[in-house]
């Protein structure tokens, strides 16, 4: 078989008889059995047939050459088939090469009939004792058979029976002998490649003019070049272990399961079956034959279509797979001076195409209504058609103004822009420590920052106390019929806000409140999950997915803000320790911020309302009076109190515990001696 074109070099296109070598029930290959007996004495009806005495070479031919018939090169005598052409009239004959006469100590081959099944089968004895002296012609032919067996084996497509690499001696049905038959099979001559090429070309010509199936001849032509016909599963039971069963004498037969299985190894029972039905089903001559690779591709596509059908996904149209990859315009590159060279920063076209396709797929997912749990369960169908959701772009495109000013065209076509669009990026919990629960939420237009509606104050109080009569987040989402993740220009005032309030600055924004951190005493009421406009009440909930990058950005921003608060507090404590140190009733553990941090309650600090407002809370009503704490050390020795692991350092017991569990630096003895200035060891003295 040619490695490139996959044409069988050694196959005969019009083989009158196929050798049915069945490995599995639905294999569909045509096998030709090789016979290299002497040319002079063919298979007579009753005369014995002579086999060459060196059976090892024969075994090699039998093993390797089973799948391809030997085709003699021009000028060589062609080997005979296993049966005469004249014997066609006497019905089907199934020959079985048995290995029964091994006890006689000589390589005797017998063709055994099945015991009583078909009376018309006759027994033929082949004995090596009455071998005619072999002439030069026979040796020559044998050499050719071996060479071609090697050529077949080298192409790597030989079907080895039972998939075992070596099957021992054909005479002994017992455990296979371990003697390698390589030294006999190895050919030490060159293959005549010119002749092989000639033969290949003539084969190709023959295959071109022979139609794919010739009904006049009983059997289909050998598989035409590069064809693996898709095997149709036979509707009969699988065969036992490679044995093919004698078929009924009418021309169209099928394999039957064999009841009596001989103890012969399966590779030895090679049989000749004369029925066209046992071979691979022939496709109609109109259909173009496909190569194995094409077949794999077709099967994969069918599997994919099946899966799409099961999951309820539409078939991807071809125009969806075509992607516009943004590339630099050609005219900017045209310069007569510089030689064109590859841009280093850009990925290859394939990578770019994959990236663009991936983002397209994600956006389509989001636009179809964020089916997270739904894609794999198509049986749940919503009662009303879902309105198209806006395409939520990734976070970096939200931050670029041009993408905000011009939303995606298809989304704009889907439904007109609602009155107010909000971007919720930074939640007010970030500013929450500086606000009290009664104060209104910060508006994004006032501060130029993004904000998210907080759960601490209810919608009604927020709508009542808010200085601008903007719509509450819930009304906003209902009026627009869209999720909260849609975009708004943060630098423009919401269009719904009344004009009168625009210049008013409320003093609450600039009122400084004492920083007091305490965990909320009662857990916040669990809010009823809000049903968006596109959701059906009984349906499985669809979560709005936050893109991973925005989540990371939010987390990073929170940590930065938290760190800034801590640094500011430490700086205040360092500069004015007496002014800012907490009053004794506040210094207990459950009010301290770090202890609540250590206990895992973070991020939910409500800030207590104080009856009076002043820049900072002082110890006395006189501002900036420094009172010495009673137990203070002289100020030179006062060291900055540092919190460690959420433990209050002014607490004596805690510090004792800290001292007890502190890890001292382990030094080995040499290091200790070095630090105690003992430089020389005792041996040196």
From Swiss-Prot:
Biological processes, Gene Ontology terms: cell division; cell migration; establishment of centrosome localization; establishment of mitotic spindle orientation; mitotic spindle assembly; organelle localization; regulation of protein localization to cell cortex
Compositional bias (Polar residues): 454-469, 478-488, 589-607
Keyword Cytoplasm: yes
Alphabetical keyword list: Actin-binding, Cell cycle, Cell division, Cell junction, Coiled coil, Cytoplasm, Cytoskeleton, Mitosis, Phosphoprotein
Positions bearing Phosphothreonine: 172, 179, 219, 287, 377, 583
Entry coiled-coil feature ranges: 551-575
GO molecular function: actin filament binding
Protein name: Mitotic interactor and substrate of PLK1
Biased composition range(s): Basic and acidic residues: 355-371
Keyword Zinc in record: no
Protein's job: Plays a role in mitotic spindle orientation and mitotic progression. Regulates the distribution of dynactin at the cell cortex in a PLK1-dependent manner, thus stabilizing cortical and astral microtubule attachments required for proper mitotic spindle positioning. May link microtubules to the actin cytospkeleton and focal adhesions. May be required for directed cell migration and centrosome orientation. May also be necessary for proper stacking of the Golgi apparatus.
Region annotated Disordered, chain positions: 155-181, 207-253, 345-499, 575-607, 629-651
A GO term from the CC aspect: actin filament
Family: Belongs to the MISP family.
Ranges annotated as biased composition (Low complexity): 392-417
Post-translational modification: Phosphorylated by CDK1 and PLK1. CDK1 is the priming kinase for PLK1 phosphorylation. Phosphorylation by PLK1 is required for proper spindle orientation at metaphase.
Protein location: Cell junction, Focal adhesion; Cytoplasm, Cytoskeleton; Cytoplasm, Cell cortex
Domain of life: Eukaryota
Transmembrane segments: none
Quaternary structure, from the entry: Associates with F-actin. Interacts with DCTN1; this interaction regulates DCTN1 distribution at the cell cortex. Interacts with PTK2/FAK and MAPRE1.
Residue numbers carrying Phosphoserine: 78, 214, 284, 348, 382, 394-395, 397, 406, 436, 477, 547, 549, 581, 592, 681
